[in-house]
């Protein structure tokens, strides 16, 4: 039974309401107490009680019967003794549970709102980890979402029986006692409410609930006007965060902060003590979403393994300043490594993180980042600094022991039309990322670090961009790339279409320049060799301005059954060049230098296609089958471009899509001459819901003239594919067995040489309803690459050797690709999974990477142990093959869920890079 309190004085709202419950005004006019009284509420709001006659008392119900720890009339706890005089044992102390829940309170831990997995609803299962045997589910109760402040909220009280002592001003409740005010609810077997002291004492199976938190104990003291409480021999649960623990006593403050004395904290299930944090004083603040603890030991199976005087940890997913989980590693060139990140929650729209990284062999690396989010932009600044104590590279060129990195990434819009973007990274030396790790988000570890800023204006039918882009070398085994300083583009479509004609234009003005490195390169042993930039010769050493104009007119005609698009395009390019004396003296055969160059090339094409479909049935399944033939004619006359340098151009990789391009080169420095007819056909099988079960495409080009325009130094007469009458067959195939199984393949077959130019096949399996299972099997082959050879300064066609036969660093077919890649993560028994990958290079008969190990995963922690072999790349020479060295290691990763990774962050890194689907698996798991 529960009654809403009337308008009594606010000093003591809970006691007055409890007295009303004891009075039971709607059912009886009496209470059960040491003496019997008739009581009613006076006009002033006070009690008006008179003794009952003995005759009336005969018909009263029996007094409440109390258990072994009942509350006496004066509010003290009594105990029950056996006939021998021995005290009956009470509830087990939480200190005896060794980090687990108390089974003495409930064998199934239902006293902690624990619900076994088989009893969870579908919605609750979706929020439960895959290896959790259940979840903490807060029961629905009145007032659980009440936001009324405690001082203004009325109180409701219920009990099976009650009595009131007017002289002592103590109300005693017994049997399923419930006190509820605002969002807080307290349950117990017995309660004594003291009006004079404005407090309550509760005994027996005490449960305090408020704001998604539950505290269970043997007895409690409650401040009736503020909601402050102390619960002895306490266990607690934070439902949404799956957090639990215990304490000698727990205190709930008026602001709902929970303080634990000699308490524990864990995300493990009630029957598990796999890991716990145990501290002298633990504070949990639901308002901020974080907790603190002092004199903390991390315990595994109740065995202390780590001590810290202070820790700051999250209890939900909100941000708050404090230390993040540390990372501990050992081995490699850095020795023992400890990272202790500290997070600064500066404002809702910006924050910062400091990453002090101590390396025993190098010293202290200080790294930090600042992130911001505004109404029209987002981005981050970052930086790092280290005075390196490792002198392994002290003789090498370009090395600096004062090592640093800066980074800025930005995306924004001044309004709906103006866009800004910055991607800038700079480092002290080219070996920075080979020697040092970084914790900054978004920093890309590549050979060429991007240093770019752009401003774009988007009109209704056009876009204009001002771009400045440079590159910083993070390697000594590559030549210096060109910078675009600056670049201006204007691309768009005219807003009118007379007669259905479409007018497009592409405009670019750009300055290309680079500072080639001269002199000698010194390796780790002090040996000298010529820098790779010295191998660059002829027009490849030029800097210059380029203006490129490419207007076009087309007539798109589209019907339900197909399309036809004739198009005429005109490309005009103007160059203003600078060439140093070394370039002028080393021109390639046929090259001539002129400071002013121009080129104009017309391009005519006709693109057409048909669309056929029908309904069909395959193995009892209905499909829409399509047949989509495509015909593309392209004519580009030959234009001598030998005297034009190559700034940003290379030859496109041949595949099915390249059959329908109007230029076989990327960039604007070469316009390929072509007179060809490309034929292709695509077949699709589509289910009624739009799911594409299968797609198959095959095509080939018929050439009517040789392709004479080539990259510098490449002679078309030496290339069989430049003189062939037909292109290789280009095939693409994809089949989805279902939404879990997928097979992709592309294959390019040369009919003239009767050999494969390139191809790949990839099988991927990852069930949508169980992404923990992953199988990948792939094969790649490519022997048709067109690349620039840094060691010779020449363009090379085909797989390509490194160096020349007889050279000390010569490696045959170094750039030819012939590899298989197999990876798997597969559950072998519940909670145990096998992890493996094997990437093998058939061309060089070597394993590129192989690892194998296992993963154990449960509700509160995860462990991975992996034995790995890989080809490590650490530059001590300009010859790339000499920098490759096999390495081995055994990696251990331990993740305490709800606390963070203890060790092994590198395991997560190479699994993410090496196993397709790994990131989706981890995102689902957490």
UniProtKB/Swiss-Prot annotation:
One of its GO terms (cellular component) is transporter complex. It is found in: Cell outer membrane. InterPro entries: LipoPS_assembly_LptD (IPR020889), LptD (IPR050218), LptD_C (IPR007543), OstA-like_N (IPR005653). GO terms for biological process: Gram-negative-bacterium-type cell outer membrane assembly; lipopolysaccharide transport. It comes from the Bacteria. Residues 58-99 are annotated as: Disordered. Its main location: membrane. Keywords: Cell outer membrane, Membrane, Signal. Residues 68-85 have a biased composition (Low complexity). Residues 1-22 form the signal peptide. Belongs to the LptD family. PANTHER family: LPS-ASSEMBLY PROTEIN, LPS-ASSEMBLY PROTEIN LPTD. Component of the lipopolysaccharide transport and assembly complex. Interacts with LptE and LptA. Together with LptE, is involved in the assembly of lipopolysaccharide (LPS) at the surface of the outer membrane. This is LPS-assembly protein LptD. It comes from Pseudomonas savastanoi pv. phaseolicola (strain 1448A / Race 6).
């Amino acid at each position: 039974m529960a009654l809403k309190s009337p308008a009594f004085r606010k000093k003591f709202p809970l006691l007055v309401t409890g007295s009303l419950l004891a009075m039971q005004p709607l059912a009886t006019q009496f209470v059960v107490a040491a003496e019997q009284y008739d009581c009613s509420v006076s006009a002033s709001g006070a009690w008006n009680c008179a003794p009952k006659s003995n005759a009336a008392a005969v018909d009263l119900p029996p007094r409440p019967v109390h258990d072994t720890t009942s509350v006496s009339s004066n509010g003290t706890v009594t105990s029950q003794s056996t006939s021998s005089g021995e005290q009956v044992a009470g509830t087990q102390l939480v200190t005896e549970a060794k980090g687990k829940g108390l089974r003495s309170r409930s064998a199934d831990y239902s006293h902690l709102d624990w619900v076994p997995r088989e009893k969870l609803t579908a919605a609750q299962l979706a929020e439960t980890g895959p290896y959790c045997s259940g979840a903490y589910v807060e029961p629905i109760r009145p007032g659980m979402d009440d936001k009324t402040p405690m001082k203004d909220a009325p109180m409701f009280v219920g009990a099976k029986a009650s009595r009131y002592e007017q002289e002592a001003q103590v109300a005693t409740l017994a049997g399923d006692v419930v006190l509820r005010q605002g969002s807080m609810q307290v349950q117990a077997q017995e309660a004594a409410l003291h009006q004079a002291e404005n407090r309550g004492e509760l005994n027996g199976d005490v449960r305090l609930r408020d704001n998604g938190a539950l505290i269970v104990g043997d007895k409690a003291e409650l401040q009736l006007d503020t909601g402050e409480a102390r619960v002895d021999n306490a266990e607690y649960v934070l439902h949404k965060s799956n957090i639990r623990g215990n304490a000698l006593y727990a205190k709930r403050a008026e602001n709902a902060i929970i303080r634990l004395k000699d308490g524990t904290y864990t995300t493990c299930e009630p029957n598990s003590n796999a890991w716990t944090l145990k501290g002298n004083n633990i504070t949990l603040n639901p308002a901020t979403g974080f907790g603190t603890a002092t004199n903390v030991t991390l315990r595994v199976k109740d065995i202390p393994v780590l001590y810290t005087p202070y820790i700051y940890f999250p209890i939900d997913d909100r941000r708050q300043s404090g230390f993040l989980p540390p990372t501990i590693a050992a081995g490699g060139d850095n020795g023992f490594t400890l990272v202790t990140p500290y997070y600064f929650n500066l404002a809702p729209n910006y924050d910062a993180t400091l990453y002090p990284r101590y390396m025993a062999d190098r010293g202290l690396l200080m790294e930090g980042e600042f992130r911001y989010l505004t109404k029209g932009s987002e981005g981050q600044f970052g930086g790092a600094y280290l005075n390196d104590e490792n002198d392994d590279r002290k003789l090498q060129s370009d090395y600096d022991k004062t090592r640093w990195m800066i980074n800025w990434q930005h995306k924004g819009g001044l309004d709906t039309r103006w866009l800004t973007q910055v991607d800038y990274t700079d480092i002290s030396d080219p070996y920075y990322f080979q020697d040092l790790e970084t914790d900054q988000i978004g920093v890309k570890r590549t050979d060429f670090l991007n240093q770019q800023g752009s401003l774009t204006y988007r009109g209704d039918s056009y876009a204009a961009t001002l771009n400045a882009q440079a590159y910083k070398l993070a390697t000594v085994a590559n030549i210096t790339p060109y910078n675009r300083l600056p670049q201006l583009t204007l691309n768009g479509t005219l807003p009118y279409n007379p007669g259905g004609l479409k007018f497009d234009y592409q405009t670019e003005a750009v300055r290309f320049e680079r500072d080639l490195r001269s002199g000698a390169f010194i390796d780790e042993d002090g040996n000298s060799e010529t820098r790779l930039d010295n191998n660059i010769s002829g027009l490849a050493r030029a800097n210059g301005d380029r203006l490129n104009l490419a207007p076009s007119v087309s007539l798109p005609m589209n019907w339900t059954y197909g399309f036809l698009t004739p198009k005429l395009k005109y490309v005009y390019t103007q160059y203003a060049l600078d060439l140093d004396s070394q370039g002028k003296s080393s021109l390639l055969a046929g090259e001539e230098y002129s400071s002013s160059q121009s080129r104009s090339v017309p391009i005519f094409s006709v693109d057409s296609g048909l669309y056929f479909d029908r309904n069909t049935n395959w193995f009892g399944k209905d499909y829409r089958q399509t047949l989509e033939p495509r015909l593309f004619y392209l004519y580009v006359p030959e234009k001598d471009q030998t005297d034009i340098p190559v700034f940003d151009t290379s030859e496109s990789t041949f595949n099915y899509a390249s059959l329908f391009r109007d230029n076989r080169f990327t960039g604007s420095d070469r316009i390929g001459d072509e007179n060809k007819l490309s034929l292709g056909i695509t077949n699709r099988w589509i289910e009624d819901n739009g799911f594409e079960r299968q797609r198959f495409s095959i095509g080939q080009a018929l050439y009517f003239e040789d392709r004479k325009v080539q990259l510098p130094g490449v002679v078309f007469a030496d290339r069989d594919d430049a003189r062939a009458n037909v292109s290789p067959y280009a095939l693409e195939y994809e089949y989805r067995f279902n939404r879990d199984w997928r097979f992709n393949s592309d294959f390019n077959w040369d009919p003239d040489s009767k050999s494969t130019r390139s191809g790949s096949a990839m099988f991927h399996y990852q069930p949508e309803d169980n992404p923990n299972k992953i199988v990948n099997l792939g094969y790649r082959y490519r022997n048709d690459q067109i690349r620039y050879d840094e060691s010779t300064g020449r363009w090379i066609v085909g797989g390509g050797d490194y160096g020349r036969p007889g050279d000390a660093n010569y490696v045959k077919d170094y750039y030819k690709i012939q590899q298989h890649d197999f990876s798997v993560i597969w559950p072998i028994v519940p909670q145990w999974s096998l992890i493996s990958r094997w990437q093998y290079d058939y061309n060089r008969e070597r394993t590129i990477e192989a690892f194998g190990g296992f993963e154990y995963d449960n509700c509160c922690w995860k462990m991975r142990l992996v034995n790995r072999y890989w080809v490590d790349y650490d530059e001590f020479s300009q010859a790339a093959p000499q920098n490759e060295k096999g390495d081995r290691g055994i990696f251990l990763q331990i993740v305490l869920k709800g606390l963070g990774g203890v060790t092994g962050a590198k395991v997560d890194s190479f699994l993410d890079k090496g196993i397709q689907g790994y990131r989706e698996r981890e995102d689902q798991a957490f």
